[in-house]
Swiss-Prot record:
Residues 2-199 are cytoplasmic. It is a single-pass type II membrane protein. It comes from African swine fever virus (isolate Tick/Malawi/Lil 20-1/1983). GO terms for cellular component: host cell membrane; membrane; viral inner membrane; virion membrane. Essential for viral fusion with host endosomal membrane and core release. A lipid is attached at residue 2 (N-myristoyl glycine). It comes from the Viruses. Keywords: Capsid inner membrane protein, Host membrane, Lipoprotein, Membrane, Myristate, Signal-anchor, Transmembrane, Transmembrane helix, Virion. Residues 221-236 are extracellular. Its main location: host cell. The chain crosses the membrane at residues 200-220. This is Inner membrane protein pE248R. Belongs to the asfivirus E248R family. It is found in: Host membrane; Virion membrane.
Amino acid sequence: MGGSTSKYSFKNTTNIISHSIFNQMQNCISMLDGKNYIGVFGDGNIINHVFQDLNLSLNTSCVQKHVNEENFITNLSNQITQNLKDQEVALTQWMDAGHHDQKTDIEENIKVNLKTTLIQNCVSALSGMNVLVVKGNGNIVENATQKQSQQIISNCLQGSKQAIDTTTGITNTVNQYSHYTSKNFFDFIADAISAVFKNIMVAAVVIVLIIVGFIAVFYFLHSRTAMRRRKKLNRS
């Protein structure tokens, strides 16, 4: 949150996890009742005052196959961290490589606690719910009324201890690093200034060493030239 002291909430994290799961499962969801199908396709469409009463058809075998794919949890954790970024949650440590990456914390939390069977069950709860499909760029849909499919996933997740542990862990991680960012803002500036001065000092030392080296070489060459001249004078 870039220096903000506000607390990220459990509810926000739950919504982000639900949204991420829903997005990961889009390929397993199709529409029922083609007569009432509402879809927005193409670019630049503006749709106002939409009332939707549609049902979802859920391909359970697709869901089962999808959640068991090797990269599913990785993709899900990437989706969640990206959604956190989109919500302006600070996912940086002020360029300080010495602090543990909270993105790694979030990924490990998901891998340990958010089991694929739980995800499959919560997605299966969507069967019969409503959905609005919008595809393309620059589309605007306003005043749309529909049942919240993602809320069904949220309610399912809140009924599982594993999911609660995941959500709590992610929320604590975000708040921990946001607190670090806020608490250490001026420390970071001081460290940056100190680093600049250190770099200047290092550069100054290098320049001095180069100058000393040139002087030493000049003195050495000058001494050899003087010795040769003295030898020539002695011979003459």
